[in-house]
Amino acid sequence: MSQRQPQSPNQTLISITNDTETSSSAVSNDTTPKGWTGDNSPGIEALCAIYITYAVIISVGILGNAILIKVFFKTKSMQTVPNIFITSLAFGDLLLLLTCVPVDATHYLAEGWLFGKVGCKVLSFIRLTSVGVSVFTLTILSADRYKAVVKPLERQPSNAILKTCAKAGGIWIMAMIFALPEAIFSNVYTFQDPNRNVTFESCNSYPISERLLQEIHSLLCFLVFYIIPLSIISVYYSLIARTLYKSTLNIPTEEQSHARKQIESRKRIAKTVLVLVALFALCWLPNHLLYLYHSFTYESYAEPSDVPFVVTIFSRVLAFSNSCVNPFALYWLSKTFQKHFKAQLCCFKAEQPEPPLGDTPLNNLTVMGRVPATGSAHVSEISVTLFSGSTAKKGEDKV
């Protein structure tokens, strides 16, 4: 008869624990504390594949998000309302990639939680803050795109950038508030296998023996960080679709071309935000479902099998990968960002094309000419400068 091993209650990223080593012991058939040796345990090839995958996620994610942030701060034309939110999203992804992903990678070789009680609280707080920033930012972005599509010709106020920065800061504060209980109640708990007389330390948001708390925690995480925000986003995008379906351009002929371009630009950005939302939903769904499954079908012991381990690794990797795919989705969807991304990636400054007259600020437009002087053949130069506080064509929605 095969020996039954304990199964840690949390085998998902949503509760950042050292449960992978206990789940690895669940797929092992040996009696050693590590849980990595035995007929059913992952071999060196599997470990190498796991660490290569994590290394790719971390390096590619840091590179992509760092370039996105650099493009935003170095390129004046990219400092627009939607790009402020997207840059805030990149900061949240970088935070996760620099802290939680490397910590999670240590679980596959370590026997217990390595970072102590303080590390447990801090990392739990960072992890949930990053997830909150991502989903709440996407929700606000969807609301912003709905307003832009419904009122495509409305000029933004002069303080729009400042107000958007304040909104982005508010999202971070709200995410931290939601993550605060996680930091307060997270602790290092002992998980024991009576058959092997071995104990493991696990960073959890609740005592391992409290099944009801586990069920409540998994449901709250699923609702607050997935179902509710995505439901709000779905409502906004259904309204956007209805508006676009019913819309007719009842505008004067001389303004037709400019209005169409502005509307098409805002529709294109709405599509970009929708792709980012879809990527978030796809990457995080397996993680949430797996956490719910383990919370409501908890068993103290599980038969040794590679399947739980593989499914757990897949859900973690997919969730982490969401933090590195956004810059490349923007590269695919936005020619403007693609140009700046290539310039930064190749370490050279892209040549800036001569801006067309329609994009030239009127407060910087100078007209020069030569006219003959009165009563003589002498030719004089004249220079006329136009002063205005607006531009001929706005770029507030460039992505």
Swiss-Prot record:
Record keywords, A-Z: Cell membrane, Disulfide bond, G-protein coupled receptor, Glycoprotein, Lipoprotein, Membrane, Palmitate, Receptor, Transducer, Transmembrane, Transmembrane helix
Record topological domains on the Extracellular side: 1-41, 104-121, 185-220, 294-313
Gene Ontology terms for molecular function: bombesin receptor activity; neuropeptide receptor activity
S-palmitoyl cysteine lipid modification positions: 347
Any matching Pfam family: 7tm_1
Role noted for this protein: Role in sperm cell division, maturation, or function. This receptor mediates its action by association with G proteins that activate a phosphatidylinositol-calcium second messenger system.
Membrane topology: Multi-pass membrane protein
Cytoplasmic side: 64-82, 144-163, 242-272, 334-399
S-S bridge residues: 120-203
GO cellular component terms, A-Z: neuronal cell body; plasma membrane
SUPFAM superfamilies: Family A G protein-coupled receptor-like (SSF81321)
Family matches, as Gene3D superfamilies: Rhodopsin 7-helix transmembrane proteins
One biological process term in Gene Ontology: G protein-coupled receptor signaling pathway
Source organism of the structure: Rattus norvegicus
Subunit structure: Interacts with C6orf89.
InterPro entries registered for this protein in UniProt: Bombesin_rcpt_3, Bombsn_rcpt-like, GPCR_Rhodpsn, GPCR_Rhodpsn_7TM
Transmembrane regions: 42-63, 83-103, 122-143, 164-184, 221-241, 273-293, 314-333
Record: glycosylation sites: 10, 18, 29
Subcellular location: Cell membrane
Domain of life, source organism: Eukaryota
Similarity comment text for this entry: Belongs to the G-protein coupled receptor 1 family.
The protein, known as: Bombesin receptor subtype-3
